Amino acid sequence: YTLTTMATIKPFKGIRPPQDLVEQVASRPYDVLNSAEAREEAAGNEKSLYHIIKPEIDFPVGTDEHDERVYRKAAENFRMFQDKGWLVQDDKENYYIYAQTMNGKTQYGLVVGAYVPDYMNGVIKKHELTRRDKEEDRMKHVRVNNANIEPVFFAYPDNAVLDAVIARYTAQKPVYDFVAPDDGFGHTFWIIDRQEDIEVITKEFAKMPALYIADGHHRSAAAALVGAEKAGQNPNHRGDEEYNYFMAVCFPANQLTIIDYNRVVKDLNGLTPGEFLAAVGKNFTVEEKGTEIYKPAGLHNFSLYLDGKWYS
């Protein structure tokens, strides 16, 4: 791979549902629910994307989701969805805008092909360690489908030029616009198909020294590793083949909200609240913050809620 120092992206021919089927096809991400929940959500809906991203639901309850047959089923279903016209590939390479509305707040993301060498060279910044077993699971999924079924989420530095392009498209009628029944989140989608706009977006990203993974460390690692693997297997590798790119939705930093990632501890293991706080105090500086909700103020700062009180 050639060394990259700025972000490289490209438009791509998206594979997506027709307008009238999008609500039936759309699903939550693969990693926010278990097999039983996916089975329940997809019940009676043969068009649900869960048949591709959680294909174990098409097998008897208790089937190991890492069984080779399950991965093969994902590929079989992906082909079937295309054969039946539930997923259709666009004729030309586009960028797309995907907006999510949560609790009254909307964030607008650019859907792009991110560049594998950018991941390898650190232009795409990571902030989580990944587990090899989870990488391997997603790698098998990418390999067997020869596609990125789900995008990763990136943050990019605020950019007025991109804001203006996005504002122009989002003022128009969207291709998709629906509210998901399970969580009430709004999903809206536009296609950026004008060549001049596509070139402007590519050029603006080429000025960015870094993109940041907001969500999807394992999917990013898997896509990049499979891309590198395919490059190694191709004696005529040029660097512009499709496998050098993976699907990412990029949100400007000013629109991203960092949501709590909380953990519930069910009991104090026989300790009183005072003893528990004293034990925590051996490794942390503990400070009482009162009854109002307290959120971490910086790196290595945690908040703790115990017996009606907040602690830093």
List PLM regions with ranges:
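Surface-exposed, charge/polar-rich loops and edge strands
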Residues: T5-S312
